[in-house]
Amino acid sequence: MTNNIRSLEQTLLENLPWNKARIKFLARFLLALYAVRTVNLASLATVFAGHAKEESNYKRLQRFLRKFELPYVQLAEFVVKLLGVEGPYTLALDRTNWQVGAVDINILLLSIVYRGVGFPVVWLVSPWPGNSSTEERKLLLELFFELFGAHQIACLLGDREFVGQEWFRFLKRHQVKFQMRLKKDTQVRNGRGQLVPAWRLFAHTGLNRCLVLPAARRMWGLELFLSGCYLGNGEYLILVAPEYTPAPHLEYKKRWGIEMLFGALKSRGFNLEDTRLQDPARLDKLLALLALAFTWAFVVGEWQAAVKELKLKKHGYPPKSIFRLGLNILCRLVTNFEYFDVTVWNRVIKLLSCT
């Protein structure tokens, strides 16, 4: 296994200009994470490669998250390089939260959507509950601008939390196209200039039939375009955009990719909520490591799905997601030494090398 770890270290070193000690840690962290499928440090410490005692491994994990100044730009660029997808990108913005004891963990995350899945590129971790602020959202977008440029955004997708005058002005100022969902009772003007709940404009569209209003409406002091459809049971999907779009709901469906990401980071992959970390800075670093681990697993699954035709179940979907397919392969490689396949290992390393 030593030679295999070295090949992983060498590949990481070729893509991340870190010192050797940090690269060695990252390689062992990835292997341990794929083995135990949890971010719980105590569990990771039990399978950390090397001759060190479990207690020493645990302290090493803590020390990395506490002291190492992680170069997030390099990791974000590596994630995008690993995906092999070029911009402009469809982005999905969302928030997830949970509690560690009495402490709130709140993560605002921006992801690139590719093949129906979100891939994390920038995020903010907050120690307080509740919705994100406009300033937090603007900061997140500015981080993306610094990395890739505003021109690399094809469309920004977000749920009902992400609306407001200052926020929309910011997006329009940077010429960012967006599709944001509105609450159905948001007050808008109808054709006669009367203020009515937004859902009334789409009350007669029919079930799951989309209507795009041809003229802009004045909202939050801005000229914005509305579209909507009735979902049944009193629910409406109402979208707001800075310009007329023929089929906005098809674009908005891509927002589901970030929900897929959160599921993979949590219960269907790395069990993020198992962490006992409470400090935002340490959680920030942990998320960066998970971004790389998640993307590598997806790319491995993508390769496997291409060489081995997946049988679809009755509902029309494969039994495993591409991410889970890749995660299972990596898990088997790092845990089942009796059946270790060096050919497969070399292949997954080549995928990580982006060559």
Residue ranges and their predicted role:
Residues 1-40, 50-52, 74-76, 86-89, ...:
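Single, function-defining residue in the core of a domain
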Residues 47-60:
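Short, basic interhelical loop/turn and adjoining N-cap
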Residues 58-116:
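Active-site-proximal, Lys/Arg-enriched surface segment
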